[in-house]
Amino acid sequence: MNENNDDINNLNTPCVLVLDSVVRNNCIKMNERAASLGVNVRPHMKTHKTIEIGKYQFEENKNLNKSRGIIVSTLSEGKFFSKEFKDILYATPIAPNKVKDAYQLHLSIDRLNVMFDNIEHLKSMVDYAIKNPNEFQKKWSVFLKIDCGYHRAGADPKLQSTTDLVELIVNGEYNQYFQFQGIYSHSGHSYKCQTPTDIKNLAIEEARVTGDYGKKLKSLGYKVDTVSIGSTPVCSHLPHNLLSEYGVNEIHPGNYTFYDQMQYELGNCKLEDIGVHVLATIVSIYPERNELLVDAGSLALSSDPGCTHLRDLKVINNFGIVYNDTNLRIVAPSQEVSKIQSTNQSPIDFSKYKIGSKIRIIPNHSCLTAAMFSDYHVINNDNQIINSFKPNKHW
């Protein structure tokens, strides 16, 4: 749907605004950063969940990823993006109840790459192949997920049992069912870093752990096409010798399309790089207690508190900040409304903030915030609505 020349002040609130030129520029900069190091970007779709922004992530031929391979967080996303992208990685170790749908998607595109970090994942995929011999037309395409220190998912690369999984599918009894693509790690613990220097050191550590394991597998005779690392913080502070020293040839950031207050606080972006805002309406003002009330609560902003480890919570705890007046912060979100206070308790200029007027909020965590909405209003540099994007929803 095209909404040319519409003013954002006419929109019902709360709603999401996507800053088109900012998002495009974020995509280009990440691709250029990776290309300068000689590595691919396999972008994650989970933040924006839209075909349009997925295309932005491959614009201007800056991305060395010629297969236009992407990552999704759900099979619903996989089906949604399969209309445009044919090399998809499903980023969660596969549960048995997802196997059938995953294989049907695999058959419909060039390949659906599936994660495993446990022999039970392999068994469930083999079991499906054995029970459905007429449907099993091509091997499963798989990545081994390894743990580089986040401790959420992934096999321990130091254990022999991890390498035994690779042997099982490459040379062992499961060989006829699998095509091994490579290894994948995710440094989600980068969001707990204190400084950009800490993130740079963690990026080196993830590259070392993942790269060394890739080299080990190759030394044992295994073909490892892809060694993939990343999170948006790490991919914003990549070591210059990523490929030459560590053998890492792919990164997989996701949040960088939008960024958010967390990324800003961590030093991964500037405020002007944040490509998504929540538009809200001031529903009441309280000069006597120096507060505003807006119609964007937890169901519009999420309740993610962000980088609390970087804040003096007695002074600056917040669930988002006000665009163009970052001294104002969202506090105490309830379901449909939130209070706004000033960071240092300085007097709010109520002449600027009237009941019924609109404000734009920079969210703590854009992935969760964007997921709250069924459409995005795309705006240009003049704050005019130029398009509407509809994201994939649910599972």
UniProtKB/Swiss-Prot annotation:
Identification of the protein by name: D-serine dehydratase
Residues recorded as bearing N6-(pyridoxal phosphate)lysine in the entry: 46
UniProt xrefs under CDD domains: PLPDE_III_DSD (cd06817)
Coiled coil: none
The protein's Enzyme Commission number: 4.3.1.18
GO MF annotations in UniProt: D-serine ammonia-lyase activity; metal ion binding
Chain positions recorded as pyridoxal 5'-phosphate binding sites: 184, 191, 232, 254-255
Gene3D superfamilies: Alanine racemase, D-serine dehydratase-like domain
GO BP of this protein: cellular detoxification; D-serine catabolic process
InterPro entries linked to this entry: Ala_racemase_N, D-amino_acid_metab_enzyme, D-ser_dehydrat-like_dom, D-ser_dehydrat-like_sf, PLP-binding_barrel
Null mutant phenotype: Knockout leads to a loss of D-serine degradation activity and an accumulation of D-serine within the organism. Delays development with a prolonged period spent at the mound stage and decreased spore formation. Decreases expression of acaA and carA-1 during starvation.
Keywords: Detoxification, Lyase, Metal-binding, Pyridoxal phosphate, Zinc
Chain sites annotated for binding Zn(2+): 365, 367
Organism expressing this protein natively: Dictyostelium discoideum (Social amoeba)
Family: Belongs to the DSD1 family.
Enzyme class of the recorded protein, top EC level: lyase
Catalytic activity: D-serine = pyruvate + NH4(+)
Known function: Catalyzes the conversion of D-serine to pyruvate and ammonia. Plays a role in D-serine detoxification.
Swiss-Prot/TrEMBL cofactor(s): pyridoxal 5'-phosphate; Zn(2+)
